Amino acid sequence: KNVRAVSFNFHTPYPDTRELALSKEEKAACCDVIAQMMKEGAPVFNLKSAFPYLIENRFPTPCHQCVVMENGKLSTCGRCIDVPGLCEQCGYFFVAEYTLLFRGNPKIIFEMLRTYLKYI
């Protein structure tokens, strides 16, 4: 009753979990399913216009607008920032969405306004 929408992420392959990483083809298939769910009215908080960037991992990282507190340590974006090369494999949808938003991507801006006004 209190959940208004869900948000999805891909696995970010930390050194001890690389085998869980998805291929580009698997990411595309996941995004197709999520997009279909959205089309059918499922309450999904992700931005469809960010999917191509997520599939190809071609969005700016790290997200300087996001901070994470974990085990008493404050990190820009998340603890993955401390692992060399991991940002380039980021699976966090919010990172793509926010970095593209703050870079002025018009599609992202429009869709974020529409989505956030719908669920917040």
Question: Model regions: which residues?
Answer:
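Radical SAM enzyme [4Fe-4S]-AdoMet core and its adjacent flexible, acidic
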Residues: K1-H64, R103
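Flexible mid-to-C-terminal extensions adjoining Fe-S/redox cofactors in radical SAM and related proteins
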Residues: N57-I120
